[in-house]
UniProtKB/Swiss-Prot annotation:
Unidirectional NADP(+)-dependent cortisol dehydrogenase (in vitro). It comes from Xenopus laevis. Residues 1-18 form the signal peptide. This is Hydroxysteroid 11-beta-dehydrogenase 1-like protein A. It is an enzyme of class 1 (oxidoreductase). Disulfide bonds: none annotated. It is found in: Secreted. The gene is hsd11b1l-a. The keyword rRNA-binding does not apply.
Amino acid sequence: MAGVKLLLLSLCVGYTAYHFYSSESMNPESVRGKRVLITGSSTGIGEQIAYEFARMGAHIMVTARRLQRLQEVANECLKLGAASAHYVASDMGNLTSAQYVAQEAVNKLGGLDYLVLNHIGGSASFGFFKGEMDPVVGSIYINFLSYVQLTSAALKALQESQGSIVVMSSMSGRIGAPFTTSYCASKFALEGFYSSLRREFALQNSNMSVTVAVLGYIDTENAVKKVGNKVSMSASSKEDCAREVVKAAVLKQPELFYPYWGIKPFVLLRDWFPGLVAKILDNFYILENIQ
């Protein structure tokens, strides 16, 4: 066991060093005038991603369910330097609505360079699976099928611009996590679909890119409210997370791990030492607060 722990530590240090010393730099001017659609952008990571693109002079469209919050986010984008800022209220539980959002973005922005898929939904609580099917169906519908519908509707515009698709995934899409069965299922589906799509772009010699952001526990209002008293770990900054997501998108990186040191080592070791990884991760849960 001591040898395994030493190996784990060595890999963590090695990959962390590689990550920081091999990081590419991003030219913000390359984003000026680009056209960006961000879903789930009335709050949390999506809101912060909108602000990051706005600071670089992009044309922004934000979408979520709350109209007033979208108006506020769009106004803030303009203050931060967005070339233009638009908004449309939508419910991603309706695939027709998802298709409409993509078409509206293309029409209002005159095309599309970045499709950022960030919304999340479903009625599943953080707890033991008790056999209910509605949360599973809802999660797959909103967190997977609507992503595919948006991609399908925006694909022609993205092909014309040789643009980028950015998908918010999770460590739960790489390593099955307890108490989030429906959420895990939707994230594993995202990982499979968009990894496959990325390979298709490459085989067509297309410059289109797919960036999958594999995220950990981020200090969004929704995440903290849902799991804050159920896990013994610190949440990472949503502002820092958004900056890293935008950087990865602009550089057309296939994957982003954030926080890097909290996710990448476990993903690397999952297949080698699955029992050890599960034991370490399970220690973060406060079982007496989970039903």
